[in-house]
């Protein structure tokens, strides 16, 4: 699967089987490809950073609003619209993968569904801030992204030597 910026993807089960991280939002059983993931390329490593989308907007709006009330902002959840429905972009659950693990792009009537530019910009900005906080030792993301990144970078290195 070739990555295209600005779209949402589904991930192969193989990724979840490989990394074994209980904090990741896994594909649903029964062959349905959920959740969907917005993805951004890290130009330094070539890895893709996946941000799960949730349709459970009320649940995440309550968490978002509580953080805004307490801290004046919420970095880890972006509320917006995707594919004509309200959605929560869960940066608190983001993680890295290789392009190899992309299964397919999310479509509606066989057409790829883009993420609105304003949401893409907001997610990108917040992701950069979260990664900066993480690099300074702040725990803002649930998955063990350091371990996941090392697994993916090792695969990139192994594939480069094959």
Set out the residue ranges of the language-model regions.
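Compact nucleic-acid interaction/catalytic patches
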Residues: 29-33, 44-81
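Short beta-strand-centered aromatic/proline hotspots
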Residues: 35-40
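Short His-Asn-centered micro-motif
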Residues: 11-13, 41, 51-53
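A broad, low-specificity signal marking well-ordered, structured residues that form hydrophobic/aromatic
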Residues: 7-9, 48, 89-95
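Residues that form or immediately flank small-molecule/cofactor binding pockets and catalytic motifs
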Residues: 14, 55, 99
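C-terminal terminal-subdomain/extension
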Residues: 64-162
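GIY-YIG nuclease catalytic motif and its immediate N-terminal context
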Residues: 1-33
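Sequence-level motif detector for i,i+2 pairs with an aromatic at +2
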Residues: 3-6, 45, 86
């Amino acid at each position: 699967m070739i990555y295209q910026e600005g779209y949402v993807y589904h991930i192969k089960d193989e990724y979840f089987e490989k990394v074994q991280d209980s904090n990741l939002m896994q594909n649903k059983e029964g062959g349905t490809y959920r959740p969907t993931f917005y993805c951004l390329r890290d130009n330094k490593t070539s890895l893709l950073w996946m941000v799960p989308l949730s349709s459970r907007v009320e649940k995440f709006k309550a968490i978002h609003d509580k953080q805004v009330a307490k801290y004046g902002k919420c970095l880890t959840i972006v509320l917006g619209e995707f594919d004509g429905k309200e959605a929560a972009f869960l940066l608190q659950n983001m993680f890295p993968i290789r392009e190899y693990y992309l299964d397919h792009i999310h479509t509606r009537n066989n057409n790829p569904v883009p993420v609105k530019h304003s949401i893409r910009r907001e997610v990108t900005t917040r992701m950069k801030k979260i990664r900066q906080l993480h690099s300074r030792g702040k725990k803002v993301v649930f998955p063990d992204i350091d371990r996941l990144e090392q697994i993916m970078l090792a695969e990139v290195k192994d594939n480069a030597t094959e």
